[in-house]
Amino acid sequence: MGEQPIFSTRAHVFQIDPNTKKNWVPTSKHAVTVSYFYDSTRNVYRIISLDGSKAIINSTITPNMTFTKTSQKFGQWADSRANTVYGLGFSSEHHLSKFAEKFQEFKEAARLAKEKSQEKMELTSTPSQESAGGDLQSPLTPESINGTDDERTPDLTQNSEPRPEPTQNALPFTHSSAISKHWEAELATLKGNNAKLTAALLESTANVKQWKQQLAAYQEEAERLHKRVTELECVSSQANAVHTHKTELNQTIQELEETLKVKEEEIERLKQEIDNARELQEQRDSLTQKLQEVEIRNKDLEGQLSDLEQRLEKSQNEQEAFRNNLKTLLEILDGKIFELTELRDNLAKLLERS
């Protein structure tokens, strides 16, 4: 085509599953450039998208097409020529709305272009149709007569306005035998011509059917060649689009590399956190082991403390018994001392008396 794209955007491309007519089949692994083109040679608008060198969308916009938004970021349209339904997934609702606006705009432009083309065809074909109509009226007239003058009159009424003249001239013809024989011969000639025309018409009808079949085959082959030519033209005409697409891919790759770098830094940070967590886990395990050892040591000390408490209690009991014994001995000694004191006093008194 050679034209530059009128409008371009990026989207994920899908086609309806030809078997189920329900599921979407992706035709691109990633988002690709989808462009509107104007084909000035054929006066049509096209939607074209390439995935590398392969044309995954080559749709001619017609007035009866409709672009339908099925969600906030997805839209679709049916292409009867390609016998499929295309679907586009956009990155945002804004891109979807912009594409839908352009679709409606170019659809209206296609309708106006079609109307202008039809008007031109009607203007150019009207004189030839009139001349062809005039040529066909004469052979069809004998077929409509079917052998009688009464049946020829309505046919003449359709093709010419001076209707009363045959009726006025028919009166003198009925009174003239010579003229009657002339008309009989003319009628026989017309019947023969009618039979020949009928046979020719049947043969022409058969030929027309054959020609229609051949024409359909030629049209199908022409459409296939046209699609192939369009694909080749797309490959050659979209060099700039491919360059733009390459630039966009490089930019996307750069963005992905930056994103990858950020992700790698985040992964390093997470690794560091994991190492720290492992160190904390090791410290926790070490402290847990030490705590268990301390608990075991504590149990041992508790056992020793219990033993010492028992021994202390036993010692205290022994000391208490010893004290009680000493107290008893002291009481006995006190009694003995008291008795000795009394004995001394008594002895002293006895000495004094003697």
From Swiss-Prot:
It comes from Bos taurus (Bovine). Pfam families: WH1. One of its GO terms (molecular function) is G protein-coupled glutamate receptor binding. The modification N-acetylglycine is found at residue 2. Postsynaptic density scaffolding protein. Binds and cross-links cytoplasmic regions of GRM1, GRM5, ITPR1, DNM3, RYR1, RYR2, SHANK1 and SHANK3. By physically linking GRM1 and GRM5 with ER-associated ITPR1 receptors, it aids the coupling of surface receptors to intracellular calcium release. May also couple GRM1 to PI3 kinase through its interaction with AGAP2. Forms a high-order complex with SHANK1, which in turn is necessary for the structural and functional integrity of dendritic spines. Negatively regulates T cell activation by inhibiting the calcineurin-NFAT pathway. The modification Phosphoserine is found at residue 306. It is found in: Cytoplasm; Postsynaptic density; Synapse; Cell projection, Dendritic spine. Residues 138-147, 155-172 have a biased composition (Polar residues). This is Homer protein homolog 1.
